[in-house]
Amino acid sequence: GGIGLSFSMLTEKMGAAQVIGIDPVEARREKALEIGATNTIDPSKDDMYEALEDLTGGEGIDIVVDATGDPEGFGQSLKIVKRWGTFVSFSLTGSTGKISEFPHQEFMFKAATIIPTQVAATSQPTKDIREMIALKERGWADPGLLKSHNVGFEDVQTAYDMYANHEDGVIKVVMELNGGGKS
């Protein structure tokens, strides 16, 4: 989704030689390739582990970012991270907050650095917005590239339904409070 795409955009700018986007939604895989990913994998059709083995020569991934919101994402990330790699957990896992598995042997063998994050939480939103604007002005990241739809505020439920059901290639929706508009 939008968080994973943002990481794809930024890591490519930071010089990552290979950026792999994993997403079951075709529109998001296409967007990932447009904004910096070198490869994408559809985990609903492809064996993700086999595809990653081929793409990395069996070495695993240096930096894995889990932004799936899926309880299985944590365990999968530990399985695909390179030995002594880094795993950034940027994912909430539903109302229980529990992960489905913790592959302890992978954890011990990989000796990966695990970095937890605070998802969508900030005490200074205007500061964060200014930083994002500065990144855009320097050509580092353009959050506008993630916008897939504009809707007027009166269509908030339609926008939410599109987002919740992954309809119409939705990635990020901009709500316009002044009766804006349809695209």
Predicted regions located by residue number:
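Mid-domain Rossmann-like dinucleotide-binding core that forms the NAD(H)/NADP(H) cofactor-binding site
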Residues: 1-46, 50
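Conserved amphipathic alpha-helix within the SDR
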Residues: 48-58
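C-terminal substrate-binding/catalytic core of Rossmann-like NAD(P)-dependent dehydrogenases/reductases
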Residues: 53, 97-148, 157-158
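N-terminal Rossmann-like NAD(P) cofactor-binding module of classical short-chain dehydrogenase/reductase
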Residues: 62-65
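C-terminal hydrophobic helical "lid"/dimerization subdomain
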Residues: 75-78, 127-183
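Helix-to-beta-strand junctions that scaffold the AdoMet/dcAdoMet cofactor pocket
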Residues: 81-83
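Glycine-centered, small-residue-biased loops immediately flanking beta-strands
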Residues: 85-86, 112
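Acidic carboxylate diad motif detector
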Residues: 90-91
